[in-house]
Amino acid sequence: MPQLLVQAPPWVRGVFDHAWAPMQALTRQVSSLPDALCDYLMACEVGFLAICPGESRYQLGPGRIRDREVQNVAYVSVEDLAHDNERPLHVIGHLIDHHLGCGGDPKGPWLTDGGGATPGWQEAGGRLPGLFALGYGPDEIALSDVRNYFAQSLALYCRERQRLNVADPQIHKWFRSVLWNKGFWRAQERQRRKGSR
């Protein structure tokens, strides 16, 4: 966003020494996600990532960034990037949950709601409410609801895997065997191609 650092608090400008620095910080965080997931999200017709002043949040449905119509935006706070905390990946986790569940359809079920872009995703996502119900979420945010459980756990898997594994070994195993599993991604791509014929 133009003038992002000008709009940011002075302490943020002290962390970032040039206008592209927040984007570089976001790129570092996103680079911890699996390549197959990033490829999948890039292929979706909707879904957008933007750095903003204010709070990090996921906005479902239509929006506008500059003069561009967009849909399903993960707004990442420049302050969260300056703090180098897990909030950017948490918000991106909501975008991932939504798009793996229904490809970003505003009225479709998210992965954590029982949706799934393929039968394999639906089966994998169907396990998430049961894992959440066990009550082993790594922190209060993760324990608040199943969507936050997924998003916060994903952020911690990217940043503090050992902490997540100690707090909730089952969701750690889910991420390792599903989202970070190249074989699982290949199988989903085969299912998707088979379904489009």
State what each model feature region is.
Residues 30, 34-37:
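Generic structural signal for alpha-helix starts
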Residues 2-17, 22, 38-197:
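Active-site-flanking segments in enzyme catalytic domains
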